């Protein structure tokens, strides 16, 4: 009893009749994959992989008596197939162990989610923001990156400057009901009105500094 396996980088390739043979699986994409070779072998497979286990933050070896399929499907539909002892015949134990050691030594897997690609430019946001100011003759005093652990007091104190450049790309934390929302100094739905309030606030702070007067103010939120 043998199987014919298409040699493409995708799972779910084993079929049980010619009518099922397709070059399109859920791992190949709609366009499928070009197959240049096939493998004819005995209908006996093992699944073996190395993955990261969160509970102890280290690699773990996964073995299954059902090869050629996604291990996620096996775990959900047939968990007893994931075995603690592989049950290799004695004549292939040494060969299997050697392959496992080689696989472990090569263990490295990086997955990139294409939906997260847009976030990469966020880390350049600081340089871009400060560079724009310098090109127009300004000198940024600070770049504020508000993390998830920022307190209301920290956010409020950080805004005690003469001018504020708020440059937001996407946003990592929610604004509704969060510390950022609680610590806001000015709240205005109209951008023109908000700009006027910022200018007036800046003028007041400037005059106070020139007069060496410590002015405290409170605006309605």
UniProtKB/Swiss-Prot annotation:
The record marks 1 as: Important for substrate specificity. The modification Phosphothreonine is found at residue 139. GO terms for molecular function: ATP binding; succinate-CoA ligase (ADP-forming) activity. It is an enzyme of class 6 (ligase). Keywords: Acetylation, ATP-binding, Ligase, Mitochondrion, Nucleotide-binding, Phosphoprotein, Tricarboxylic acid cycle. The modification N6-acetyllysine is found at residues 22, 26, 196. ATP-specific succinyl-CoA synthetase functions in the citric acid cycle (TCA), coupling the hydrolysis of succinyl-CoA to the synthesis of ATP and thus represents the only step of substrate-level phosphorylation in the TCA. The beta subunit provides nucleotide specificity of the enzyme and binds the substrate succinate, while the binding sites for coenzyme A and phosphate are found in the alpha subunit. PANTHER family: SUCCINATE--COA LIGASE [ADP-FORMING] SUBUNIT BETA, MITOCHONDRIAL (PTHR11815:SF1), SUCCINYL-COA SYNTHETASE BETA CHAIN (PTHR11815). This is Succinate--CoA ligase [ADP-forming] subunit beta, mitochondrial. It comes from Mesocricetus auratus (Golden hamster). The lineage of its organism: Eukaryota, Metazoa, Chordata, Craniata, Vertebrata. The gene is Sucla2.
């Amino acid at each position: 009893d043998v199987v014919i396996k298409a040699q493409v980088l995708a799972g779910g390739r084993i079929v049980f009749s010619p009518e099922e043979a397709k070059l399109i699986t859920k791992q190949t994409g709609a366009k499928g994959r070009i197959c240049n070779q096939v493998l004819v072998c005995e209908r006996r497979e093992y699944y073996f992989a190395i993955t990261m286990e969160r509970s102890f933050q280290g690699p773990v070896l996964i073995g299954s008596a059902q090869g050629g399929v996604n291990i996620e499907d096996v775990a959900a539909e047939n968990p007893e197939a994931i075995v603690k002892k592989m049950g290799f015949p004695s004549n292939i134990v040494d060969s299997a162990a050697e392959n496992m050691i080689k696989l472990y030594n090569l263990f490295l897997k990086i997955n990139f989610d294409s939906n997260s690609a847009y976030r990469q430019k966020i880390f350049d946001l600081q340089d871009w923001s400060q560079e724009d100011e310098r090109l127009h003759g300004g000198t940024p005093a600070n770049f504020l990156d508000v993390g998830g652990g920022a307190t209301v007091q920290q956010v409020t104190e950080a805004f005690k400057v003469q001018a504020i450049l708020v440059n937001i790309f996407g946003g990592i934390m929610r604004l509704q009901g969060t510390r950022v929302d609680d610590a806001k100094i000015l709240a205005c739905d109209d951008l023109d009105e908000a700009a006027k309030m910022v200018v007036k606030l800046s003028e007041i702070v400037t005059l106070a500094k020139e007069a060496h007067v410590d002015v405290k103010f409170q605006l309605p939120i």
